[in-house]
C-alpha cells in the first residue's frame, strides 16, 4: 500500500504584472543609443518527484533587468556594431539541481544578481565576404542562498552560466560560378568560458572552443550542404552533476554530414 509521507497544497495560483520601459535616441541615420528597464517573472510550480527532504512546491521567480546600449554603423554601413551593459537583480531565483533517483529538482535561492556586457560586430570589407565577431562577459553570483540550516551557497557563482562567451565567423559567397547561382564557404569558431555545474562550485568545466565548417552550393530552389561540427573533436562536457559519484554527459564529438534543401518559394 502507499504511505503518505508529506502533505502540500494540490493547487496554487500566481499572477504578476511585468512592465517594461524603454527610451532610445537616434543620434544619426546610423547611430542609436537606448536604455531599458523591465520586470521579469517566472511562475512557481511543483516538483513532479519529491521526498520529505525536498519541497514539492517552489515559489515564483522575480527580477528586474536594466540595460543600456548602442547600435552604431561605420564605413558607409559596411561595419555594424552593437554593445550593451546589463544588470539583473533576482529574488527567489529558481535553481535546478539533479538528484539521483528523483531527476531535476527546483529550489528557490534567496537573492542573486548578474552583471556584464556584450559586444558584436559584422564587417563586410568587400563583395561576398562577411566577418562576424561576438563577445560576452557575465558575472553572476548568489548574494544570499541558504539551502538549509547548515548548507549555505552565499557568494558562490551561479551554476551553468559561463563567465565568457565568444564567437567568430567568416563567410565568403561566390556568385554565378561553375554553373551555380552561388557557392558559400563558412567557418565558425565558438568559445565558452569556465562554467560551474553545481551550486557549491566544486564541479566545473574549463574553457573550450568548437570549430564548425560548411560548404553550400545553390542552384535554383535546391541547396546542397556539406558540413562538419566540432571539427577538431574537442572533448567537453555538456552537462554534469555530482552526488555520491560524478555524473557527466559528454558533448557531441566530431560529426560530418550532408543536407539537401528545397525552397518552395523561388
How should these model regions be labeled?
Residues 87-89, 107-198, 259-263:
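Gram-negative outer-membrane beta-barrel transporters
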Residues 126, 178, 190-198, 216-266:
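C-terminal beta-signal and adjacent terminal beta-strands/loops
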Residues 13-19, 37-41, 52, 60-66, ...:
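Transmembrane beta-barrel architecture of outer-membrane proteins
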Residues 33, 66, 79-83, 131-133, ...:
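Transmembrane beta-strands of outer-membrane beta-barrel proteins
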Residues 1-28:
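Signature of Gram-negative outer-membrane beta-barrel scaffolds
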Residues 28-30, 75-78, 128, 175-183, ...:
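Short loop/turn motifs that connect adjacent beta-strands in outer-membrane beta-barrel proteins
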Residues 15, 24-26, 60, 72-74, ...:
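Residue-level signature of outer-membrane beta-barrel architecture
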Residues 26, 32-38, 57-115, 124, ...:
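Membrane-embedded beta-barrel scaffold of Gram-negative outer-membrane proteins
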Amino acid at each position: 500500500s502507499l504511505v503518505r509521507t508529506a502533505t502540500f497544497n494540490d493547487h496554487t495560483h500566481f499572477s504578476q504584472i511585468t512592465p517594461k520601459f524603454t527610451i532610445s535616441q537616434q543620434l544619426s541615420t546610423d547611430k542609436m543609443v537606448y536604455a531599458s528597464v523591465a520586470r521579469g517573472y517566472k511562475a512557481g510550480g511543483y516538483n513532479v518527484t519529491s521526498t520529505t527532504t525536498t519541497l514539492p512546491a517552489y515559489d515564483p521567480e522575480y527580477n528586474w533587468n536594466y540595460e543600456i546600449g548602442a547600435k552604431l554603423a561605420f564605413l558607409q554601413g559596411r561595419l555594424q556594431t552593437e554593445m550593451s551593459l546589463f544588470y539583473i537583480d533576482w529574488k527567489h531565483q529558481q535553481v535546478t539541481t539533479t538528484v539521483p533517483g528523483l531527476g531535476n529538482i527546483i529550489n528557490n535561492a534567496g537573492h542573486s544578481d548578474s552583471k556584464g556586457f556584450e559586444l558584436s560586430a559584422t564587417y563586410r570589407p568587400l563583395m561576398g565576404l562577411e566577418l562576424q565577431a561576438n563577445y560576452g562577459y557575465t558575472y553572476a553570483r548568489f548574494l544570499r542562498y541558504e539551502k538549509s540550516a547548515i548548507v549555505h551557497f552565499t557568494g558562490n557563482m551561479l551554476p551553468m552560466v559561463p563567465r565568457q562567451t565568444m564567437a567568430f565567423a567568416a563567410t565568403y559567397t561566390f556568385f554565378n560560378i561553375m554553373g551555380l547561382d552561388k557557392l558559400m564557404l563558412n567557418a565558425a569558431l565558438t568559445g565558452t568560458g569556465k562554467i560551474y555545474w553545481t551550486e557549491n562550485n566544486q564541479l566545473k568545466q574549463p574553457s573550450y572552443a568548437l570549430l564548425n565548417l560548411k560548404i553550400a552550393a545553390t542552384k535554383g530552389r535546391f541547396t546542397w550542404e556539406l558540413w562538419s561540427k566540432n571539427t577538431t573533436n574537442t572533448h567537453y562536457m555538456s552537462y554534469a552533476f555530482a552526488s555520491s559519484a560524478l555524473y557527466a554527459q559528454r558533448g557531441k564529438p566530431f560529426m560530418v554530414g550532408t543536407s539537401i534543401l528545397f525552397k518552395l518559394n523561388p
